[in-house]
């Protein structure tokens, strides 16, 4: 098959996240099976407009902000002649409304849709624009086959008017061969970590407040990731008088991330909504429990009481208190870190990128054959 993927960013982008990791891991494997994959995405400063990474031919156009407005024009003028067997639109940020494009076959791939959570992050005018851009999905994409990365995302699509029969749930994977436990690396004193982007909607502030409530002088919170909310979070740590025990690591390379997760007593995630929660499975693969919000997507990457703890998310003050209580439980029973971590590792091993790629390819072939 000749395949075109439309995604807001590629996996080399400095701001790449879980959607881009999925893109790389799944579609590089599809290339390895003998198929041709092109990617049309946004560009950034000082990067070539044409590239090839992991066998995927990359076409870059516009910026993060202009890509949705330039993608169709670029496709019409430069890529339509390639006569793709199938086009995959990763419904990421602002929809491209590809059912209005002239393509043979189309699949919509969804990690998660913003819905009302966009108002936690963006200014009211921008948030309203994104929210409104999602409103036509149920009507415009009603005849399009969907691939969702979690049952939570599938249910969100159904609520928006997409037929349940049109949705195939294919979970993400995790590289359990690279991400492995090493109990000898576990920190002697309680260490909690957050791994992800520092954006307002991720609610890292609740992780910091929960850690402050723990009130344990020998404990440490390490925050790995970049984003425009870092200064606010640093200010919060100072206001709570815990700046000496909260470390902001910035971007952490893959090899250092593994050691960070191995050292941690738990990984903590407070996001109100994710496609699935890849960072939770990365922690689990390293034998580290997870304390996370019982929110859409995330709840499918943690087995409450077995691989970590899920805390109610509706009331933020109560949520921070519940996260602090979960941290305190691990501190009071250190052996629980190993027990939960061992179960987490077994759980993570059931999610592989090979399976995700195989299931995705089977779904695409099924759509093309109809």
Region spans (language model):
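Membrane-proximal helix-turn-helix segments that form the acceptor-binding/catalytic region
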Residues: 125-149, 155
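Conserved donor-binding/catalytic core segment of Leloir-type glycosyltransferases
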Residues: 147, 183-211, 222
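Carbohydrate-associated surface elements
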Residues: 152, 173
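Nucleotide-activated donor-binding/catalytic signature segment of Leloir-type glycosyltransferases, i.e.
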Residues: 234-252
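Aromatic "clamp/platform" in nucleotide-sugar-dependent glycosyltransferases that forms part
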Residues: 272
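Short hydrophobic beta-strand element within catalytic cores of glycosyltransferases
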Residues: 289-292, 302
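Conserved acidic donor-binding segment of nucleotide-sugar-dependent glycosyltransferases
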Residues: 304-305, 309-320, 327-334
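A short, well-ordered alpha-helix in the C-terminal region of glycosyltransferases
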Residues: 335-350
């Amino acid at each position: 098959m000749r395949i075109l993927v439309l995604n807001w960013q590629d996996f080399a982008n400095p701001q790449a996240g879980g959607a881009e990791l999925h893109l790389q891991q799944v579609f590089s494997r599809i290339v390895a099976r003998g198929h041709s994959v092109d990617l049309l995405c946004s560009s950034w400063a000082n990067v070539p407009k044409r590239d090839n990474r992991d066998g995927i031919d990359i076409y870059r156009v516009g910026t993060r902000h202009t890509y949705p407005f330039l993608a169709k024009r670029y496709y019409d003028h430069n890529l339509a002649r390639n006569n793709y067997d199938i086009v995959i639109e990763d419904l990421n940020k602002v929809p491209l409304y590809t059912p209005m494009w002239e393509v043979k076959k189309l699949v919509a791939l969804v990690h998660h849709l913003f819905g009302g959570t966009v108002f936690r992050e963006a200014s009211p005018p921008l948030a309203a624009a994104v929210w409104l851009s999602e409103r036509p999905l149920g009507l415009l994409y009603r005849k399009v086959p969907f691939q969702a990365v979690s049952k939570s995302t599938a249910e969100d699509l159904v609520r928006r008017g997409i037929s349940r029969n049109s949705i195939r749930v294919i979970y993400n994977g995790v590289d359990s061969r690279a991400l492995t436990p090493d109990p000898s690396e576990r920190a002697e004193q309680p260490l909690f970590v957050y791994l992800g982007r520092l954006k307002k909607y991720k609610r890292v502030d609740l992780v910091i407040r929960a850690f402050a409530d723990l009130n344990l002088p020998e404990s440490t919170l390490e925050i790995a990731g970049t984003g425009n909310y870092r200064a606010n979070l640093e200010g919060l740590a100072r206001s709570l008088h815990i700046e000496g025990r909260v470390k902001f690591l910035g971007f952490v390379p893959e090899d250092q991330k593994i050691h960070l997760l191995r050292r941690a007593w738990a990984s903590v995630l407070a996001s109100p909504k994710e496609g699935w929660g890849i960072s939770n499975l990365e922690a689990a693969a390293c034998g580290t429990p997870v304390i996370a919000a019982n929110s859409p997507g995330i709840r499918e990457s943690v087995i409450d009481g077995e691989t970590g703890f899920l805390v109610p998310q509706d009331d933020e003050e109560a949520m921070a208190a519940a996260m602090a209580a979960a941290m305190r439980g691990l501190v009071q029973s250190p052996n629980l870190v190993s027990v939960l971590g061992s179960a987490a590792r077994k759980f993570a091993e059931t999610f592989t990128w090979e399976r995700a790629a195989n299931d995705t390819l089977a779904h695409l072939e099924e759509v093309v054959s109809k």
